[in-house]
């Protein structure tokens, strides 16, 4: 029997699909009892939402073979009272264990995608701990000493560390790298293949060609200044954005008024279009009906140096669509120069997009899709399941 797997991250399950959902849903489909939690609500969250909009009940939804306990405002955490916090964590851990019956006594595995959940381990008491490093956490603007302490403690406690890019090995302490494995982001190739035979979505069909696409979260990691310059230099190119803004339409791109003002100014251009967030199963319908797909990320320190460590989720999904891909020059993506073009600077971007739209891009439809198939999420989870099975067999 497979042990329960308790997974934690700050992103709500019922939101934009990221590697968490792709990984955990596949483990659930393979018979792993999976519970996904964003932790107990905080007093700040309750106040922000308003008590009347918060549920005081503890209830669970099952989605894609994963049990998802929905947030409850009962016993929220507080930064002011450590004793109250301890009680809130203990109650939350007890509720999580009650969601699914245990088939293996004392054999639970905790999988953390974010070090902020390290304190919960003391109350959940799993036998084994997996830490999936999905970001260069210390490079995040505003990273605190408290967060760094949790990050280091979780590295020491983890029995297995997985990293979403090879470059992320560099953010780990040297003495824990021997228990680290590379688990790159993959592609839902079956879903993209299905989308290839479906008609162009109505909102996208209303936009003229050539379409230069971006699918994903629209955050400060996206180089708005670059896109603005390109959109103004090539007025016939139609830039199409498909994805959410952090915090919703009024989220102001993570609280940055400057970034949000730049985004608003970009949208005022006649050849820039934002189609909003879409269900994860429909994203591929937009990717396959572009003329070229892009990863226009900030590669300098304006976004905390994120791109130096990135292996974007959309990379292999773009390749599965079979269309040309132009990307910012990211270290871990450089190995794929034979199927996409990596560039830096407005002139280089303009030249690369011009070539792509003229049919002169690296690779072809077949080679791009072949690489995506070799990097499917199913294959990634094959590797992870092997490692988890090994963990579960340890005393």
Where are the regions a protein language model picked out?
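Nucleotide-sugar-dependent
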Residues: 14-18, 277-320, 326-338
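Membrane-proximal helix-turn-helix segments that form the acceptor-binding/catalytic region
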Residues: 94-101, 105, 144-161
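A charged, aromatic-enriched C-terminal amphipathic alpha-helix characteristic of glycosyltransferases
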Residues: 361-391
């Amino acid at each position: 029997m497979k042990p329960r797997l308790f997974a934690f991250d700050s992103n709500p399950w019922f939101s934009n699909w990221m590697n968490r959902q792709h990984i955990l849903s596949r483990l659930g489909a393979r018979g792993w009892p999976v519970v996904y939690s964003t932790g107990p609500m905080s007093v700040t969250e309750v106040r922000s939402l308003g008590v009347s909009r918060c549920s005081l009940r503890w209830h669970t939804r099952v989605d894609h073979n994963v049990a998802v306990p929905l947030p409850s405002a009962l016993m929220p955490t507080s930064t002011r009272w450590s004793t109250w916090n301890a009680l809130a964590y203990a109650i939350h851990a007890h509720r999580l264990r009650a969601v699914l019956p245990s088939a293996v006594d004392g054999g639970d595995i905790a999988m953390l995608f974010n070090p902020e959940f390290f304190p919960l381990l003391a109350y959940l008491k799993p036998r084994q701990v997996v830490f999936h490093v999905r970001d260069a956490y210390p490079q995040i603007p505003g990273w605190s000493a408290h967060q760094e302490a949790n990050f280091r403690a979780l590295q020491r406690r983890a029995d297995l560390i997985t990293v979403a890019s090879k470059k992320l090995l560099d953010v780990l302490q040297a003495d824990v790298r021997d228990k680290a494995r590379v688990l790159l982001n993959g592609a839902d190739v079956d879903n993209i293949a299905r989308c290839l035979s479906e008609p162009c979505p109505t909102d996208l069909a209303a936009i003229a060609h050539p379409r230069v696409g971006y699918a994903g979260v629209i955050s400060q990691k996206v180089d708005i200044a670059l896109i603005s310059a390109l959109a103004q230099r090539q007025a016939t190119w139609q830039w199409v954005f498909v994805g959410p803004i952090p915090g919703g339409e009024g989220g102001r791109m993570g609280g940055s008024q400057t970034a949000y003002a730049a985004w608003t100014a970009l949208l005022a251009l006649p050849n820039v279009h934002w189609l909003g967030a879409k269900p994860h199963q429909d994203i591929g319908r937009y990717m396959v009906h572009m003329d070229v797909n892009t990863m226009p990320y900030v590669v300098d320190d304006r976004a905390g140096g994120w791109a130096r460590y990135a292996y974007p989720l959309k990379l292999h999904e773009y390749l599965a669509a079979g269309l040309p891909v132009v990307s910012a020059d990211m270290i871990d993506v450089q190995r794929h120069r034979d199927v996409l073009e990596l560039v830096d600077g407005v002139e280089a971007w303009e030249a690369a997009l011009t070539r792509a739209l003229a049919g002169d891009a690296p690779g072809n439809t077949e080679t791009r899709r072949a690489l995506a198939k070799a990097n499917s999420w199913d294959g990634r989870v094959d590797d992870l399941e092997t490692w988890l099975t090994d963990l579960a067999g340890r005393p």
